[in-house]
């Protein structure tokens, strides 16, 4: 009996030891496997994750620099938000085609919740039936080629007003082009939306700028979305709530005034379209939905178009040969005409090359807008959990040296034989993003860049003030969701 018990004890000990060894081997194997399948990433800190790597730099450049070291598909832990970053045309094409629907959502943000009426605008709306209907309205009604064309006369009129204002300021005196161009685009969009410029233009402009400042995606509320107390401690919730009250007051007054005067208008404005659809049986819109969409038009339209014009002029000032070439093309084609019509400049190839090259180097949204994974995805062997944020670094993609020779240089001629318009065939050129969540306002945005830029270059010669050499122009970028100049563009016109 003792021998049996001894054997049983030995057997049990052996079994436990064997089980322990097998469990250790299993855990080691699965851990090794998991490690092998983890996306490359920099070293991280507790709580904040990888945020410290982005301190002291603009997000798009900071993320680009990390990608150069850790790869064009990498993982970042931004606070409590797992994030994958795409920085190459190859991975952008793979994800925005094969996995486009899996990453069709937008992350919920405090800004979207408060300022954009619970994310009911086109840009931040979650993927689903509501978003599909909004996208359809944009494509067929608000931002169709026909609708964009219908605003041609007001674009021409407002561009001519800008020319007259600059001339009135006097030759040889510095002009704040940043301020003037932003005001021009805001006025064009105001008239397109409401049928006229609005008396509270300055207030609307400040609201739009504040919204853009709050949507950078890297502040406390964005990286710790579940820590509600931080939203209060940081002051962001209070700022956004105050901003929301201003928006409600301003847009409610505009809509009320517009409704009273609707019988006197002949051209259907963007607000007319939305009010017509408001009580539609097919897809009714609420008043808050309409306000969110109007904010999209201004927020996405004003800053992106004005900054593109600023960057184009900045690059041309820095590159006198390109400036001379585009001005010669304009002046030859227009042959002394006083006012420019859009038909006059549609076929001006070098002007269009300048715009494309500007958008390559200075995409309006350098990190586009983040997407979010709707379901777990296996991406090239990597397991991507649900709710993972996706950042596509268009800034890095547009400057990828594997696809672009002298990628950091401003060379409009590189587009001479290119058919790329708003997207490159290999996703090497993505100024407006790609896939389902691609910017629906590309046609309107390009129209609001081409004519103003042509007027500014055709009617005036430009130089830096105080005898500063062209190669000393400040090209520093600001930090935020959109790619703006850090300093305002002050230039001296002659005519």
Curated annotation (Swiss-Prot):
EC number: 1.14.14.114
GO biological process, one term: sesquiterpene biosynthetic process
Membrane topology: Single-pass type II membrane protein
Keyword Heme: yes
Catalytic activity: (+)-amorpha-4,11-diene + 3 reduced [NADPH--hemoprotein reductase] + 3 O2 = (+)-artemisinate + 3 oxidized [NADPH--hemoprotein reductase] + 4 H2O + 4 H(+)
Keyword flag Membrane: yes
Binding-site list for heme: 439
UniProt pathway: Sesquiterpene biosynthesis
Glycosylation: residue positions: 176, 261, 267, 386, 417
Keyword entries, A-Z: Endoplasmic reticulum, Glycoprotein, Heme, Iron, Membrane, Metal-binding, Monooxygenase, Oxidoreductase, Signal-anchor, Transmembrane, Transmembrane helix
SS bond list: none
UniProt-listed PANTHER family: CYTOCHROME P450 FAMILY 71 PROTEIN, PREMNASPIRODIENE OXYGENASE-LIKE
Record-stated family: Belongs to the cytochrome P450 family.
Protein name: Amorpha-4,11-diene 12-monooxygenase
Lineage, broadest ranks: Eukaryota, Viridiplantae, Streptophyta, Embryophyta, Tracheophyta
């Amino acid at each position: 009996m003792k021998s049996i018990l001894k054997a049983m004890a030995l057997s049990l000990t052996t079994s436990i030891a064997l089980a322990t060894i097998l469990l250790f081997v299993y855990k080691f194997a699965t851990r090794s496997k998991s490690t092998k399948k983890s996306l490359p990433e920099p070293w991280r800190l507790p709580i904040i994750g990888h945020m410290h790597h982005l301190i002291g730099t603009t997000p798009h450049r900071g993320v680009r620099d990390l990608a150069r070291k850790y790869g064009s598909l990498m993982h970042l832990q931004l606070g409590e938000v797992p994030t994958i970053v795409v920085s190459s045309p190859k991975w952008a094409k793979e994800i925005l085609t094969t996995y486009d629907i899996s990453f069709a959502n937008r992350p919920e943000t405090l800004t979207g919740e408060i300022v954009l009426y619970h994310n009911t605008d086109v840009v931040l709306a979650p993927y689903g039936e509501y978003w599909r209907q909004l996208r359809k309205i944009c494509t067929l009604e608000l931002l169709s080629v026909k609708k964009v064309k219908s605003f041609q006369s007001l674009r021409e009129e407002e561009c001519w007003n800008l020319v007259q204002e600059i001339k009135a300021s006097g030759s040889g005196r510095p002009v704040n082009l940043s301020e003037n161009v932003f005001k021009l685009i805001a006025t064009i969009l105001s008239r397109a939306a409401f049928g006229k410029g609005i008396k509270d233009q300055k207030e609307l402009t400040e609201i739009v700028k504040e919204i853009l400042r709050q949507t950078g995606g890297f502040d406390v509320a964005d990286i710790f979305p579940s820590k509600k107390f931080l939203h209060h401690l940081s002051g962001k919730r209070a700022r956004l709530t105050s901003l929301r009250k201003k928006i409600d007051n301003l847009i409610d007054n505009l809509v009320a005034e517009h409704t009273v005067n609707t019988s006197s208008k002949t051209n259907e404005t963007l607000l007319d379209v939305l009010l017509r659809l408001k009580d539609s049986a097919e897809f009714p819109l609420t008043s808050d939905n309409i306000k969110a969409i109007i904010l999209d038009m201004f927020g996405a339209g004003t800053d992106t178009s004005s900054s593109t014009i600023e960057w184009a002029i900045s690059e041309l000032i820095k590159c006198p040969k390109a400036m001379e070439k585009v001005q010669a093309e304009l002046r030859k084609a227009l042959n002394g005409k006083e006012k420019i019509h859009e038909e006059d400049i549609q076929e001006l190839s070098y002007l269009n090359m300048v715009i494309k090259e500007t958008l390559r180097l200075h995409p309006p949204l350098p990190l586009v807008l983040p997407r979010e994974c709707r379901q777990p995805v296996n991406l090239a062997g990597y397991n991507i959990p649900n709710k993972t944020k996706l950042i596509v670094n268009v800034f890095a993609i547009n400057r990828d040296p594997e696809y672009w020779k002298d990628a950091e240089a401003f060379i409009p001629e590189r587009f001479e034989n290119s058919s790329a318009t708003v997207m490159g065939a290999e996703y090497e050129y993505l100024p407006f993003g790609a896939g389902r969540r691609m910017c629906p306002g590309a046609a309107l945005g390009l129209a609001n860049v081409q004519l103003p830029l042509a007027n500014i270059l055709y009617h005036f010669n430009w130089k830096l003030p105080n005898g500063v050499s062209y190669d000393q122009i400040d090209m520093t970028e600001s930090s935020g969701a959109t790619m703006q100049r850090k300093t305002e563009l002050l230039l001296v016109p002659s005519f």
